[in-house]
Amino acid sequence: MHGFHDVFIQILLLLAISVTVIAIAKLLKEPDSVALVLVGLVLGLTQLPFIEEAESYITQSEVFQATVISLFLPILLGDATLKLPFHHLFSQKKTVMGLAFLGTFISSLTIGAASYFLLDLPLAVAFTFAALMSATDPISVLSIFKSLGVKQKMSTIMEGESLFNDGIAVVLFKIASIYLLTYIEMGWAGLGSGVFMFLKFAVGGALVGLILGYVFSQVIRVYDDYPLEVAFSALLFFGSYFIAEHFHTSGVIAVVVGGFVFGDYGAKIGMSEETKTNLNTFWDSVTLLANALIFLMVGLEIRNIDLAGNWGYIVGAIAIVLVGRTIAVYIGTGWIKELSSKERILINWGGLRGSLSIALALSLPMDFDGREQVLLLTFSVVLFSLIVQGLTLKPVIKKLGLA
């Protein structure tokens, strides 16, 4: 290592590669997230001296986890809340809540039980893996929807589900990886403790987001200065996340709630049209760069994963996750008459997993029993999801006649 300067230059090279890949993918009208993962895989499997140090640096567990969770996640969640009008979300509230709450719990239980009995994973490992697989990533899905002219209804459902189930999945992950075995030993008292822990994370995070969202909404009433208001939005996203985490509640839920309050209530009382336009433009650019690096980093992680001799194990995990998603979608939305069978099929196949799952897996302590198993299975499922499901989503949409 020749110092920070050399690593920084090499990371800029990776960013240049990422942006170039996005530009080419857009010309070819293919999902840029899939293209970035594939290029990352190629870079991770080859030795290129001019970016070797940067690859080694950003694929370290601590760096990847900190970059995705602490830096990029608040940005992506906050931007999504600004882009998703609350009245659109409210119009699909039954479907979004059915998927994000009921569906996420069903998915976690199904995948956890199947992994325990069929893959013979230890109980805590099985349900930790299940929690990771319950978080969905709609980034590539939404870009495909937009390019094909899929109804706004479907984009709202997919994005709304992801915003809420990410927060729930993170809470379930913490409970499964840290407290599950203790709660089981406690019996019924453990069940009560688990429910209390979940409510503490979820409600506490929501309160932090609600308070900060309201405070920043009042602050921007005083100003008509869009650079300053953009800065306030950044403070809200990162402040919500880290304050909630400091008080051991859900930072993800805090950002989502705070972002919705700021983007809906704050926009009504304190943003001019110029501010709204510039706010969206700024975060569009930032999220493009963030996603570019995230998906390239996912591909680069191949250098740290040993797939050899584990193919049966991997195929079993992929099958379990696909079945778990199907069960969750059909039970979670089975009571909703407004949703057609074709739309359910699309929601099912479009439930891609992404970088959050890998980042959370990398955050597991080194002494966590089964850490390598969780990393192997999580990485494999995410790769399958982004590449196979991502590349087949467009033909599926056309076949269903939803374009």
From Swiss-Prot:
Transmembrane segments: 7-27, 34-54, 99-119, 125-145, 168-188, 196-216, 228-245, 250-272, 282-302, 311-331, 345-365, 373-393
Domain of life: Bacteria
Gene3D superfamilies: 6.10.140.1330
Membrane topology: Multi-pass membrane protein
Gene Ontology terms: biological process: regulation of intracellular pH; sodium ion import across plasma membrane
GO MF term list: potassium:proton antiporter activity; sodium:proton antiporter activity
Main localization, broad class: membrane
Subcellular location: Cell membrane
Record field: pH dependence: Optimum pH is 8.0 for sodium and lithium transport. Exhibits Na(+)/H(+) and Li(+)/H(+) antiporter activity between pH 6.5 and 9.5.
Keyword Glycoprotein belongs to the record: no
Any GO CC annotation of this UniProt entry: plasma membrane
Keywords for the protein's UniProt record, in alphabetical order: Antiport, Cell membrane, Ion transport, Membrane, Sodium, Sodium transport, Transmembrane, Transmembrane helix, Transport
Family of this protein: Belongs to the monovalent cation:proton antiporter 1 (CPA1) transporter (TC 2.A.36) family.
Function: Na(+)/H(+) antiporter that extrudes sodium in exchange for external protons. Can also transport lithium.
Protein name stated in the entry: Na(+)/H(+) antiporter NhaH
Gene label: nhaH
